[in-house]
Protein backbone atom coordinates (compact mmCIF):
# COMPACT_ATOMS: atom_id res chain seq x y z
CA UNK A 1 0.00 0.00 0.00
CA UNK A 2 2.86 2.39 0.85
CA UNK A 3 4.40 1.72 -2.57
CA UNK A 4 1.14 2.52 -4.39
CA UNK A 5 0.70 5.69 -2.34
CA UNK A 6 4.28 6.75 -3.15
CA UNK A 7 3.74 6.20 -6.89
CA UNK A 8 0.50 8.22 -6.79
CA UNK A 9 2.17 11.09 -4.94
CA UNK A 10 5.11 11.10 -7.34
CA UNK A 11 2.76 11.16 -10.33
CA UNK A 12 0.76 14.04 -8.84
CA UNK A 13 3.95 16.03 -8.23
CA UNK A 14 5.10 15.49 -11.82
CA UNK A 15 1.69 16.55 -13.16
CA UNK A 16 1.75 19.66 -10.98
CA UNK A 17 5.20 20.62 -12.25
CA UNK A 18 4.09 20.10 -15.87
CA UNK A 19 1.09 22.37 -15.29
CA UNK A 20 3.34 25.04 -13.76
CA UNK A 21 5.69 24.88 -16.74
CA UNK A 22 2.82 25.09 -19.24
CA UNK A 23 1.34 28.06 -17.39
CA UNK A 24 4.69 29.84 -17.27
CA UNK A 25 5.26 29.16 -20.96
CA UNK A 26 1.88 30.64 -21.84
CA UNK A 27 2.81 33.82 -19.98
CA UNK A 28 6.49 34.15 -20.88
CA UNK A 29 6.80 32.76 -24.42
CA UNK A 30 5.11 34.95 -27.03
CA UNK A 31 2.63 33.37 -29.39
CA UNK A 32 0.81 34.55 -32.47
CA UNK A 33 2.09 36.75 -35.28
CA UNK A 34 4.40 39.67 -34.64
CA UNK A 35 5.29 42.55 -36.97
CA UNK A 36 8.76 43.84 -37.77
CA UNK A 37 8.46 47.39 -39.12
CA UNK A 38 11.35 48.43 -41.37
CA UNK A 39 12.29 52.04 -42.14
CA UNK A 40 8.74 53.16 -41.40
CA UNK A 41 7.63 51.68 -44.73
CA UNK A 42 4.53 49.51 -44.48
CA UNK A 43 5.45 47.73 -47.74
CA UNK A 44 8.70 46.53 -46.17
CA UNK A 45 7.12 45.24 -42.93
CA UNK A 46 7.51 41.55 -42.08
CA UNK A 47 4.87 39.48 -40.31
CA UNK A 48 6.34 36.38 -38.69
CA UNK A 49 6.10 33.98 -35.79
CA UNK A 50 8.15 34.77 -32.67
CA UNK A 51 11.38 32.89 -32.22
CA UNK A 52 14.82 32.87 -33.79
CA UNK A 53 17.24 35.70 -34.34
CA UNK A 54 16.56 38.85 -36.32
CA UNK A 55 19.28 38.03 -38.88
CA UNK A 56 17.69 34.71 -39.86
CA UNK A 57 14.13 36.08 -39.75
CA UNK A 58 15.11 38.86 -42.15
CA UNK A 59 16.89 36.40 -44.46
CA UNK A 60 13.83 34.16 -44.45
CA UNK A 61 11.87 37.12 -45.83
CA UNK A 62 14.41 37.90 -48.53
CA UNK A 63 16.22 40.70 -46.68
CA UNK A 64 19.89 39.75 -46.60
CA UNK A 65 22.00 41.58 -44.02
CA UNK A 66 25.75 41.12 -44.36
CA UNK A 67 27.28 38.63 -41.92
CA UNK A 68 30.78 37.43 -42.73
CA UNK A 69 30.77 34.93 -39.84
CA UNK A 70 27.36 33.51 -40.77
CA UNK A 71 25.60 34.75 -37.64
CA UNK A 72 28.13 33.69 -35.02
CA UNK A 73 28.50 37.14 -33.50
CA UNK A 74 32.22 37.37 -34.23
CA UNK A 75 32.44 39.64 -37.28
CA UNK A 76 30.23 42.50 -36.11
CA UNK A 77 28.96 43.23 -39.62
CA UNK A 78 25.23 42.55 -39.24
CA UNK A 79 24.50 45.94 -37.69
CA UNK A 80 20.95 47.22 -37.64
CA UNK A 81 19.26 50.00 -35.72
CA UNK A 82 16.54 48.68 -33.41
CA UNK A 83 14.22 51.50 -32.37
CA UNK A 84 11.95 49.31 -30.24
CA UNK A 85 11.28 45.67 -29.36
CA UNK A 86 14.86 44.40 -29.31
CA UNK A 87 15.34 44.03 -25.57
CA UNK A 88 18.59 44.84 -23.79
CA UNK A 89 21.89 44.72 -25.66
CA UNK A 90 23.95 41.59 -24.94
CA UNK A 91 27.57 41.50 -23.72
CA UNK A 92 28.57 39.72 -26.95
CA UNK A 93 27.43 42.76 -28.92
CA UNK A 94 29.49 45.20 -26.86
CA UNK A 95 32.66 43.76 -28.38
CA UNK A 96 31.60 45.46 -31.62
CA UNK A 97 29.25 48.27 -30.55
CA UNK A 98 30.23 51.19 -28.35
CA UNK A 99 28.01 52.35 -25.51
CA UNK A 100 27.23 55.49 -27.46
CA UNK A 101 26.16 53.47 -30.49
CA UNK A 102 24.07 51.22 -28.24
CA UNK A 103 22.21 54.26 -26.93
CA UNK A 104 21.35 55.09 -30.54
CA UNK A 105 19.88 51.61 -30.99
CA UNK A 106 22.75 49.92 -32.82
CA UNK A 107 22.54 46.12 -32.50
CA UNK A 108 23.88 42.96 -34.12
CA UNK A 109 21.01 41.29 -35.95
CA UNK A 110 22.44 37.83 -35.23
CA UNK A 111 22.13 38.46 -31.47
CA UNK A 112 18.68 40.07 -31.33
CA UNK A 113 15.92 37.60 -30.38
CA UNK A 114 12.60 38.09 -32.16
CA UNK A 115 10.05 37.97 -29.34
CA UNK A 116 7.67 40.87 -29.89
CA UNK A 117 6.76 43.58 -32.39
CA UNK A 118 9.87 45.46 -33.51
CA UNK A 119 10.71 48.70 -35.25
CA UNK A 120 14.07 48.67 -37.05
CA UNK A 121 16.06 50.70 -39.56
CA UNK A 122 18.18 49.22 -42.36
CA UNK A 123 20.35 50.89 -45.02
CA UNK A 124 18.36 51.17 -48.25
CA UNK A 125 21.09 49.42 -50.25
CA UNK A 126 20.33 46.20 -48.39
CA UNK A 127 17.13 45.91 -50.39
CA UNK A 128 19.24 45.59 -53.54
CA UNK A 129 20.85 42.40 -52.23
CA UNK A 130 19.68 39.26 -54.04
CA UNK A 131 20.28 35.54 -54.03
CA UNK A 132 21.40 33.43 -57.00
CA UNK A 133 21.94 29.74 -57.67
CA UNK A 134 25.18 29.63 -59.63
CA UNK A 135 26.96 26.86 -61.51
CA UNK A 136 30.60 25.97 -60.90
CA UNK A 137 32.67 26.66 -64.03
CA UNK A 138 35.97 25.58 -62.49
CA UNK A 139 37.64 25.10 -59.12
CA UNK A 140 41.39 24.93 -59.59
CA UNK A 141 44.43 25.16 -57.33
CA UNK A 142 46.33 28.41 -57.78
CA UNK A 143 48.66 27.66 -54.86
CA UNK A 144 49.21 24.79 -52.41
CA UNK A 145 46.32 25.80 -50.17
CA UNK A 146 44.36 28.23 -52.39
CA UNK A 147 41.74 27.41 -55.00
CA UNK A 148 40.20 29.76 -57.53
CA UNK A 149 36.45 29.09 -57.58
CA UNK A 150 34.78 30.44 -60.71
CA UNK A 151 30.97 30.58 -60.72
CA UNK A 152 28.58 31.20 -63.61
CA UNK A 153 25.75 33.64 -62.84
CA UNK A 154 22.34 32.52 -64.22
CA UNK A 155 21.64 33.73 -67.77
CA UNK A 156 20.20 37.21 -67.91
CA UNK A 157 21.31 38.00 -64.35
CA UNK A 158 24.14 40.14 -63.00
CA UNK A 159 25.69 40.84 -59.63
CA UNK A 160 26.11 44.64 -59.48
CA UNK A 161 29.16 44.67 -57.23
CA UNK A 162 31.93 47.22 -56.81
CA UNK A 163 35.62 46.35 -56.81
CA UNK A 164 36.57 45.32 -53.28
CA UNK A 165 33.08 43.99 -52.58
CA UNK A 166 32.08 40.53 -51.45
CA UNK A 167 29.33 37.96 -51.62
CA UNK A 168 28.08 35.38 -49.14
CA UNK A 169 28.05 31.68 -49.94
CA UNK A 170 25.62 29.19 -48.48
CA UNK A 171 26.76 25.66 -47.71
CA UNK A 172 24.35 22.85 -46.85
CA UNK A 173 24.88 20.32 -44.09
CA UNK A 174 27.58 17.97 -45.30
CA UNK A 175 30.16 15.30 -44.58
CA UNK A 176 33.22 15.94 -46.70
CA UNK A 177 36.42 13.89 -46.79
CA UNK A 178 39.64 15.68 -47.63
CA UNK A 179 40.80 12.50 -49.34
CA UNK A 180 38.23 13.28 -52.06
CA UNK A 181 39.74 16.70 -52.85
CA UNK A 182 41.24 17.21 -56.29
CA UNK A 183 44.76 18.42 -55.48
CA UNK A 184 47.22 18.44 -58.42
CA UNK A 185 50.44 16.49 -58.04
CA UNK A 186 52.62 19.62 -57.88
CA UNK A 187 50.87 20.68 -54.65
CA UNK A 188 50.48 17.30 -52.95
CA UNK A 189 53.89 17.32 -51.26
CA UNK A 190 52.84 19.58 -48.39
CA UNK A 191 49.45 17.86 -48.14
CA UNK A 192 51.18 14.52 -47.65
CA UNK A 193 53.86 16.02 -45.39
CA UNK A 194 51.26 17.37 -42.95
CA UNK A 195 48.91 14.40 -43.43
CA UNK A 196 46.05 16.71 -44.40
CA UNK A 197 44.08 14.16 -46.39
CA UNK A 198 43.03 12.50 -43.13
CA UNK A 199 40.65 15.32 -42.21
CA UNK A 200 36.90 15.35 -42.62
CA UNK A 201 34.36 18.16 -42.32
CA UNK A 202 31.04 17.27 -40.70
CA UNK A 203 28.38 19.98 -40.58
CA UNK A 204 24.84 19.36 -39.35
CA UNK A 205 23.19 22.60 -40.49
CA UNK A 206 23.38 25.18 -43.25
CA UNK A 207 26.15 27.76 -42.88
CA UNK A 208 26.98 31.11 -44.51
CA UNK A 209 30.36 32.78 -45.00
CA UNK A 210 31.64 35.81 -46.89
CA UNK A 211 34.32 35.95 -49.60
CA UNK A 212 35.75 38.89 -51.51
CA UNK A 213 35.54 38.87 -55.30
CA UNK A 214 38.76 38.40 -57.27
CA UNK A 215 37.16 39.49 -60.54
CA UNK A 216 36.29 43.09 -61.31
CA UNK A 217 32.86 44.38 -62.41
CA UNK A 218 33.53 44.20 -66.15
CA UNK A 219 34.39 40.50 -66.05
CA UNK A 220 30.73 39.90 -66.71
CA UNK A 221 28.63 36.84 -65.92
CA UNK A 222 30.97 35.31 -63.36
CA UNK A 223 32.00 35.46 -59.74
CA UNK A 224 35.62 34.52 -59.02
CA UNK A 225 36.94 33.80 -55.53
CA UNK A 226 40.27 32.84 -53.98
CA UNK A 227 39.63 30.40 -51.14
CA UNK A 228 42.30 29.15 -48.75
CA UNK A 229 41.57 25.81 -47.10
CA UNK A 230 41.30 26.31 -43.33
CA UNK A 231 43.10 23.28 -41.90
CA UNK A 232 43.54 22.70 -38.15
CA UNK A 233 46.65 24.37 -36.69
CA UNK A 234 49.67 22.01 -36.48
CA UNK A 235 49.84 22.39 -32.69
CA UNK A 236 46.16 21.49 -32.27
CA UNK A 237 45.22 18.92 -34.93
CA UNK A 238 41.99 17.95 -33.15
CA UNK A 239 40.35 21.28 -33.98
CA UNK A 240 37.73 20.75 -36.74
CA UNK A 241 38.75 22.06 -40.17
CA UNK A 242 37.05 25.09 -41.69
CA UNK A 243 33.46 24.28 -42.57
CA UNK A 244 32.94 26.59 -45.53
CA UNK A 245 36.40 26.26 -47.05
CA UNK A 246 36.00 22.47 -46.92
CA UNK A 247 32.69 22.76 -48.76
CA UNK A 248 34.12 25.08 -51.41
CA UNK A 249 37.16 22.87 -51.98
CA UNK A 250 34.81 19.93 -52.59
CA UNK A 251 32.93 21.68 -55.42
CA UNK A 252 33.38 20.39 -58.95
CA UNK A 253 32.52 21.64 -62.42
CA UNK A 254 28.75 21.63 -62.92
CA UNK A 255 27.87 21.71 -59.21
CA UNK A 256 25.34 24.26 -57.98
CA UNK A 257 26.27 26.89 -55.41
CA UNK A 258 24.03 29.52 -53.80
CA UNK A 259 25.34 33.03 -53.23
CA UNK A 260 23.84 36.33 -52.06
CA UNK A 261 25.03 39.89 -52.41
CA UNK A 262 26.58 42.16 -53.27
CA UNK A 263 27.96 43.58 -50.04
CA UNK A 264 30.98 45.67 -49.23
CA UNK A 265 32.69 48.71 -47.83
CA UNK A 266 36.31 48.07 -48.85
CA UNK A 267 36.04 50.46 -51.79
CA UNK A 268 38.65 52.69 -53.42
CA UNK A 269 38.56 56.37 -52.61
CA UNK A 270 37.81 58.73 -55.49
CA UNK A 271 40.96 60.84 -55.20
CA UNK A 272 44.20 61.41 -57.09
CA UNK A 273 46.38 60.08 -54.27
CA UNK A 274 48.96 57.38 -54.89
CA UNK A 275 47.62 53.88 -54.23
CA UNK A 276 49.73 51.21 -52.54
CA UNK A 277 48.24 47.70 -52.49
CA UNK A 278 49.59 45.07 -50.07
CA UNK A 279 48.44 41.45 -50.16
CA UNK A 280 49.26 37.97 -48.98
CA UNK A 281 47.67 34.53 -49.34
CA UNK A 282 44.03 34.55 -50.42
CA UNK A 283 44.10 38.30 -49.77
CA UNK A 284 45.04 38.39 -53.43
CA UNK A 285 41.32 38.43 -54.31
CA UNK A 286 40.28 42.03 -53.52
CA UNK A 287 43.70 43.30 -54.63
CA UNK A 288 43.18 41.82 -58.10
CA UNK A 289 39.64 43.20 -58.22
CA UNK A 290 40.76 46.71 -57.26
CA UNK A 291 43.80 46.89 -59.52
CA UNK A 292 42.00 45.50 -62.58
CA UNK A 293 39.12 47.90 -61.97
CA UNK A 294 41.42 50.91 -61.69
CA UNK A 295 43.46 50.11 -64.79
CA UNK A 296 41.00 48.35 -67.10
CA UNK A 297 37.62 49.90 -66.34
CA UNK A 298 38.47 53.34 -64.96
CA UNK A 299 41.66 53.79 -67.03
CA UNK A 300 43.14 55.42 -63.93
CA UNK A 301 46.35 57.40 -64.26
CA UNK A 302 46.96 57.39 -60.50
CA UNK A 303 50.37 56.15 -59.45
CA UNK A 304 49.98 52.68 -57.97
CA UNK A 305 52.05 49.72 -56.86
CA UNK A 306 51.23 46.23 -55.63
CA UNK A 307 53.32 44.35 -53.07
CA UNK A 308 52.46 40.68 -52.60
CA UNK A 309 53.99 38.29 -50.08
CA UNK A 310 54.25 34.55 -50.69
CA UNK A 311 56.19 31.69 -49.15
CA UNK A 312 57.80 30.36 -52.33
CA UNK A 313 57.45 30.62 -56.10
CA UNK A 314 54.86 27.85 -56.05
CA UNK A 315 52.56 30.12 -54.03
CA UNK A 316 52.65 32.95 -56.57
CA UNK A 317 49.66 33.26 -58.89
CA UNK A 318 48.14 35.68 -61.40
CA UNK A 319 51.73 36.53 -62.32
CA UNK A 320 50.96 36.86 -66.04
CA UNK A 321 47.95 39.06 -65.25
CA UNK A 322 49.99 41.58 -63.28
CA UNK A 323 52.97 41.41 -65.62
CA UNK A 324 50.57 42.31 -68.44
CA UNK A 325 49.07 45.21 -66.52
CA UNK A 326 52.53 46.57 -65.70
CA UNK A 327 53.57 46.34 -69.36
CA UNK A 328 50.42 48.17 -70.50
CA UNK A 329 50.34 50.86 -67.78
CA UNK A 330 53.35 53.03 -67.01
CA UNK A 331 51.72 54.19 -63.75
CA UNK A 332 51.63 50.65 -62.29
CA UNK A 333 54.37 48.38 -60.94
CA UNK A 334 54.15 45.23 -58.88
CA UNK A 335 56.55 43.22 -56.73
CA UNK A 336 56.45 39.84 -55.03
CA UNK A 337 58.57 38.95 -52.01
CA UNK A 338 59.20 35.34 -51.01
CA UNK A 339 59.62 34.60 -47.31
CA UNK A 340 60.97 31.07 -47.80
CA UNK A 341 62.09 30.50 -51.41
CA UNK A 342 63.06 26.96 -52.37
CA UNK A 343 66.42 26.20 -54.04
CA UNK A 344 64.66 25.16 -57.24
CA UNK A 345 62.95 28.56 -57.41
CA UNK A 346 66.22 30.21 -58.49
CA UNK A 347 64.68 33.35 -57.08
CA UNK A 348 66.55 36.62 -57.52
CA UNK A 349 63.73 38.93 -56.44
CA UNK A 350 62.85 40.34 -53.05
CA UNK A 351 62.97 38.03 -50.02
CA UNK A 352 61.55 38.45 -46.53
CA UNK A 353 58.24 39.53 -45.09
CA UNK A 354 56.27 41.90 -47.27
CA UNK A 355 56.02 44.75 -44.72
CA UNK A 356 59.79 44.86 -44.38
CA UNK A 357 60.32 44.61 -48.14
CA UNK A 358 57.85 47.43 -48.79
CA UNK A 359 59.51 49.65 -46.22
CA UNK A 360 63.14 48.97 -47.14
CA UNK A 361 62.67 49.15 -50.90
CA UNK A 362 60.11 51.92 -51.25
CA UNK A 363 58.52 53.69 -48.32
CA UNK A 364 61.74 54.37 -46.41
CA UNK A 365 62.80 56.81 -49.10
CA UNK A 366 59.32 57.96 -50.16
CA UNK A 367 59.02 61.74 -49.89
CA UNK A 368 55.50 61.63 -48.40
CA UNK A 369 54.32 58.12 -47.41
CA UNK A 370 51.62 59.68 -45.24
CA UNK A 371 49.90 61.04 -48.37
CA UNK A 372 49.44 57.62 -50.01
CA UNK A 373 46.35 55.44 -49.71
CA UNK A 374 47.09 51.89 -48.53
CA UNK A 375 44.78 49.01 -49.45
CA UNK A 376 45.58 45.68 -47.83
CA UNK A 377 44.28 42.18 -47.36
CA UNK A 378 46.13 39.17 -46.03
CA UNK A 379 46.74 36.95 -43.00
CA UNK A 380 46.18 38.67 -39.64
CA UNK A 381 49.89 38.74 -38.78
CA UNK A 382 50.68 40.43 -42.08
CA UNK A 383 47.93 43.00 -41.61
CA UNK A 384 49.14 43.84 -38.10
CA UNK A 385 52.76 44.16 -39.23
CA UNK A 386 51.88 46.41 -42.16
CA UNK A 387 49.63 48.65 -40.06
CA UNK A 388 52.32 48.97 -37.39
CA UNK A 389 54.89 49.95 -40.02
CA UNK A 390 52.53 52.53 -41.56
CA UNK A 391 51.72 54.03 -38.17
CA UNK A 392 55.43 54.49 -37.53
CA UNK A 393 55.61 56.42 -40.80
CA UNK A 394 52.86 58.77 -39.67
CA UNK A 395 50.09 57.42 -41.90
CA UNK A 396 46.65 58.37 -40.58
CA UNK A 397 43.84 55.83 -40.12
CA UNK A 398 41.76 57.26 -42.96
CA UNK A 399 44.49 56.31 -45.44
CA UNK A 400 44.72 52.69 -44.25
CA UNK A 401 41.97 50.55 -45.79
CA UNK A 402 41.74 46.92 -44.73
CA UNK A 403 39.71 43.97 -45.98
CA UNK A 404 39.70 42.00 -42.75
CA UNK A 405 38.39 38.61 -43.90
CA UNK A 406 39.79 38.02 -47.36
CA UNK A 407 43.06 36.44 -46.27
Curated annotation (Swiss-Prot):
Give the species this sequence originates from: Vibrio anguillarum
| Region annotation Catalytic: where it falls in the sequence | 272-389
> EC number(s) per UniProt?
7.2.1.1
Which classification does the entry list for the species? Bacteria, Pseudomonadati, Pseudomonadota, Gammaproteobacteria, Vibrionales
Chief location category: membrane
Q: What class of enzyme is it?
A: translocase
| Name of protein | Na(+)-translocating NADH-quinone reductase subunit F
Where it sits in the cell: the answer is: Cell inner membrane
Enumerate the Pfam families for this protein: FAD_binding_6, Fer2, NAD_binding_1
> Which InterPro entries does UniProt cross-reference here?
2Fe-2S_ferredoxin-like_sf, 2Fe-2S_ferredoxin-type, Beta-grasp_dom_sf, Cbr1-like_FAD-bd_dom, FAD-bd_FR_type, FNR_nucleotide-bd, NqrF, OxRdtase_FAD/NAD-bd
Segments spanning the bilayer are 3-23
